[in-house]
């Protein structure tokens, strides 16, 4: 039986994850026409997890989520996604591509929000168990450049809570992701997301060829 493969995409706001996941999905379907390719996002995926996503992404005037509430909501979404979506797909031998996963929780709620990293890892472990990525593609871009992209692609009123954080928050996010990549070099591949779209895509394909036996 074909072994499933789990790839996650990480990075700061405006790094181009959505575009690159779409391009990778198209490339995999072309090269592996008989292989199931499953694409989803975190938070989100199954219907219940999508409802949690709406709470996390939409501002609540006068009652902003405290960091621990964010952490627990992300964990609830991940638990639902792992059991309803990712684990069954991997058992079927699918290639699973997810836009953000637990690394984002550790970086956003830990490095940027200031929660204890060990507490975050314990919560993530409870939520996800043995479901862990085989490869994480970290799309790295300077925060000011990524935020400029988000302003270009969407009106100011369409930005979510994380887009509108201060620049210092996004700088902490980038630092957190790069530290995570340094600590996990076998799993995390750093991609230069400041390059043009096709160059970024080729970097991703090369990282997959080097680290996984699927292409």
Tell me what each language-model feature is:
Residues 2, 23-27, 144-215:
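NTP-dependent small-molecule kinase module
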Residues 6:
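Walker A (P-loop) ATP-phosphate-binding motif of ABC ATPase nucleotide-binding domains
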Residues 12:
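P-loop (Walker A) phosphate-binding loop of NTP-binding proteins
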Residues 17:
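Conserved lysine of the Walker
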Residues 20:
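Hydrophobic positions on the alpha1 helix immediately C-terminal to the Walker A/P-loop
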Residues 31-128, 203:
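ATP-dependent small-molecule kinase phosphotransfer cores
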